[in-house]
Swiss-Prot record:
This is TFIIA-alpha and beta-like factor. Coiled coil: none annotated. GO terms for biological process: cognition; transcription initiation at RNA polymerase II promoter. GO terms for cellular component: cytoplasm; male germ cell nucleus; transcription factor TFIIA complex. InterPro entries: TFIIA_asu/bsu, TFIIA_b-brl.
Length: 468
């Protein structure tokens, strides 16, 4: 059972219903019928461009053949330079440039939906027998089972005298599930009336370049044999003008433009020789930048070092000498300050004696033996006094009677204190006034803090009642 796609019919029915529904409104407002038709056509075009459906508004699956009759006065330079780019896996009726130059020549094309560029002065005949003569360059395509002429503007450059014409046609790669949808989309072509650009690459094997670019040249008169690694094939005389570009933004490039090809050829990616001095210079600069990033070296310092090596060495020596001097002075200061008392004293009596001897020997001409004897006597007397004072203090502490602690005779004992605060609700405040009526009490409190139910409250005024 054949699969029937109902989505296009659904879209078409919705569009027709809406157009019929607003037809009366357009008539009441005085809008012309052509505006409504243009609206419907625009709607259908938008749905088609959105790729919401496949085979949208396709009435026939037959592909009529389009016969092109080349005139006798057509310049012979057109045929050997004509080129087409078609996807791999498709076949094209073979014909040679010699066949195109014959008097009664014709070519049949069976590409439905693909536009064909027809230059001025050419006549073409459809399968129905209608003959059309072209006076200006046009684009011919076939959609919905009929042949249409699209006069879209395309780029033209004035042709130089005696130069061949280059026509380039690009066709997108077709997925099996979107083959019919892709045939509906018309691709614009650019006819560039200028000589093909001349590439100036270094001496490189042409066969090697073609294999690297995944292109295969097709000889005239032979059927296309697609290559698995390359999705596109080229015919003889193919040109890559710099202005050639796809006008559909949604399509991927068919082949690289001549600029990128020229860049690849000039960069010589196929050469196997040793790298040049520029390559070595780049490697050295990259290694130097890597070292700078590792060691934290500044690029400006490196530049300054390269420009002024002698001054930098002198400044480095001065900085090094100043740093050594500062370190030496700091070490001397640390060695002079020695802890000789307190808990951090780790020096022995011999070290202390040597330090005192060094201090006393600093001024040998001022301090004599008599002065030293007087100092020793004063030290001995002070030591005896301190010993006597310490012994008197110890005797006084032993003979002093023990006294009772303060508040020892209070009525409240220590055991009764916890009972006073054996409650969860505590109020600390000031009493404003208290009223009593028999066993009822009423309290007026102010400026207090209350802990009630495990939560703390601060209040300015409070009233409480109690019975007991």
């Amino acid at each position: 059972m054949a699969f029937i796609n109902l989505v296009p019919k659904l879209y078409q029915s919705v569009i027709e219903d809406v157009i019929e529904g607003v037809r009366d409104l357009f008539a009441e407002e005085g809008i012309e019928e052509q505006v409504l038709k243009d609206l419907k056509k625009l709607w259908e075009t938008k749905v088609l461009q959105s790729k919401a459906t496949e085979d949208f508004f396709r009435n026939s699956t037959q592909v009529p053949l389009l016969t092109l009759q080349l005139p006798h006065a057509l310049p012979p330079a057109l045929q050997p330079e004509a080129s087409l780019l078609i996807p791999a896996g498709r076949t094209l009726p073979s014909f040679t440039p010699e066949d195109l130059n014959t008097a009664n020549c014709g070519a049949n094309f069976a590409f439905a939906g693909y536009p064909i560029h027809v230059p001025a002065g050419m006549a073409f005949q459809t399968a129905s027998g209608h003959l059309y003569k072209v006076n200006v360059p046009v684009m011919v395509t076939q959609t919905s089972g009929r042949t249409e002429i699209l006069q879209h503007p395309f780029q033209q450059v004035l042709q130089q005298l005696g130069q061949p014409l280059v026509i380039q046609t690009t066709v997108p790669t077709l997925h099996p599930c979107s083959l019919q949808a892709a045939t509906e989309k018309s691709l614009r072509m650019e006819a560039v009336l200028q000589p093909p650009p001349i590439l100036h690459p270094p001496p490189v094997d042409r066969t090697h370049v073609e294999n690297a670019a995944s292109d295969r040249r097709l000889l005239p008169g032979n059927e296309l044999r697609p290559q698995e690694s390359s999705p596109y094939l080229s015919l003889p005389g193919v040109g890559f003008p710099p202005q050639a570009a796809l006008t559909e933004s949604s399509l991927e490039p068919v082949l690289g433009v001549s600029a990128s090809l020229t860049q690849n050829l000039h960069s010589d990616p196929f050469s196997q020789g040793p790298p040049g001095p520029l390559h070595h210079h780049l490697l050295e600069s990259q290694l130097q930048s890597l070292k700078d990033s590792i060691y934290g070296c500044d690029s400006t310092k490196q530049l300054r070092k390269a420009e002024e090596p002698s001054s930098l060495r002198v400044s480095e020596k001065n900085c090094t000498s100043e740093r050594d001097l500062n370190i030496r002075v700091t070490d001397d200061d640390i060695n002079e300050i020695i802890q000789i008392d307190g808990t951090g004293d780790n020096s022995s009596t011999e070290e202390m004696g040597s330090i005192r001897d060094a201090d006393e020997n600093e001024f040998p001409g001022i301090i004599d033996a008599g002065d030293l004897n007087v100092l020793e006597e004063v030290d001995s007397v002070s030591n005896e006094d301190s010993t006597a004072n310490s012994s008197d203090n110890e005797d006084h502490q032993i003979n002093a009677p023990e006294e009772d602690p303060l508040n020892s005779g209070d009525d409240v004992s220590e055991q009764d204190v916890p009972d006073l605060f054996d409650t969860e609700n505590v109020i600390v405040c000031q009493y404003d006034k208290i009223h009593r009526s028999k066993n009822r009490w009423k309290f007026y409190l102010k400026d207090g803090v209350m802990c009630f139910g495990g939560r703390d409250y601060v209040f300015a005024k409070a009233i409480g009642e109690a019975e007991w």
